[in-house]
């Protein structure tokens, strides 16, 4: 009998492969997205110093639709990054498909002024 692959394990393997090439620096940090069933979390990370420069999550917001919350989190993360003087980032989708909540975060961050 063939066993079904665990979606999260497959995503983690995909994210590991991508992380070998995506590296955030102080000049161009990494915008990392983590999606749970209930919330979405975004961090702006400098991989050289292993420091989180800015972050936002749906826990900071009022209750709402998941896609609307994702775009609000993307906008909030972009505003916090711009306050710290970060204008360009490398987008790390965390092994997720560029669709739905991940796409909403990316588009809202771009509209708020981040370049990637």
Curated annotation (Swiss-Prot):
Keywords: Ribonucleoprotein, Ribosomal protein, RNA-binding, rRNA-binding. GO terms for cellular component: cytosolic large ribosomal subunit. It comes from Exiguobacterium sibiricum (strain DSM 17290 / CCUG 55495 / CIP 109462 / JCM 13490 / 255-15). It comes from the Bacteria. This is one of the proteins that bind and probably mediate the attachment of the 5S RNA into the large ribosomal subunit, where it forms part of the central protuberance. This is Large ribosomal subunit protein uL18. Belongs to the universal ribosomal protein uL18 family. GO terms for biological process: translation. Gene3D superfamilies: 3.30.420.100. The keyword Cell membrane does not apply. Part of the 50S ribosomal subunit; part of the 5S rRNA/L5/L18/L25 subcomplex. Contacts the 5S and 23S rRNAs. SUPFAM superfamilies: Translational machinery components.
């Amino acid at each position: 009998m063939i066993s079904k692959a665990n979606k999260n394990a497959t995503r983690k393997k995909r994210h590991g492969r991508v992380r070998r090439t995506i590296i955030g620096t102080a000049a161009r940090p990494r915008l990392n997205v983590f999606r749970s069933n209930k919330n979405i979390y975004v961090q702006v990370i400098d991989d050289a110093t292993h420091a989180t420069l800015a972050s936002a999550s749906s826990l900071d917001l009022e209750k709402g639709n998941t896609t609307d919350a994702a775009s609000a989190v993307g906008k909030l993360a972009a505003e916090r990054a711009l306050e710290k003087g970060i204008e360009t980032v490398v987008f790390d989708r965390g092994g997720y498909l560029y669709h739905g909540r991940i796409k909403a975060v990316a588009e809202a961050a771009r509209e708020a002024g981040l370049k990637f």
